[in-house]
Amino acid sequence: MRNGSPMTKKTKIYFASDQHFGIPDPESSRVREVKFISWLDEIKEDAECIFLLGDLFDFWFEYKKVVPRGFVRVLGKIAELRDSGIPIYFFVGNHDLWMGDYFQKEFDIPVFDRPKEFDFNGKRFLIGHGDGLGPGDKGYKRMKKVFAHPFSKWLYRWLHPDIGVRFAQYLSTKNKLISGQEDVIFLGEDQEWLVQYARRKLESKHYDYFLFGHRHLPMEIEVGENSTYINTGDWIT
């Protein structure tokens, strides 16, 4: 209780994506990290659960004994929320697709590498990051298969972290094929590939909501009868 008031009911589900912590430099990233932590503090009183929809970090790779330097405040706040009993679900994005078992073991947070169905209050949700879904973007899809392959992860581990992280940061900011992102402009409902993906999924099964990130563009679009596609935007633009 606080000042004698009854405890707030935890009835809200929160979604966030594409924080890309780590870029363009530590100082700029720190500003966004502080804002994100403040937001987590605001929602912790009534959060039934929290979904992090990928690209929390602009780069993340787990060696057996090493994880990327930095992000201590963000990770500490996530640990605090988990210790308080709030469920958190993490979907890897195209920038943190090399997430291993660190979040699972350290925070007891399940990590998903593809869209997953959830049911809340009688509503069916399909939730994920959003990269590589729908038609088109074939170059990125081929690249993702290579990067996500266990052999690629094994090979990358042989790079010293100072070299591996610097190389990955360069690719992250310079190569659009790897980032898998278009310019952050609305392409129209017929051209937005996550809208097309949602409509095709509805041909075989009804979903009340599709929740994705990746596009860095907030959207809410009706994709069918009683079915809505929502994009969470980002924490950069």
Where are the regions a protein language model picked out?
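N-terminal amphipathic/basic-hydrophobic helices that include classical n-h-c signal peptides
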Residues: 1-6
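Beta-strand-turn-beta hairpins that frame and shape the catalytic cleft
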Residues: 7-14, 118-126, 223-228
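Core catalytic region of metal-dependent phosphoesterases/phosphodiesterases
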Residues: 9-12, 16, 21-120
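Short, solvent-exposed loop/turn segments at secondary-structure junctions
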Residues: 20-21, 57-58, 96, 132-133, ...
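N-terminal short leaders/motifs
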Residues: 58-82, 180-190, 194-210
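Conserved beta-sheet core of the metallophosphoesterase superfamily
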Residues: 108-113, 126, 131, 137-146, ...
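Active-site-proximal loop/helix segment associated with metal-binding centers of metalloenzymes
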Residues: 130-193
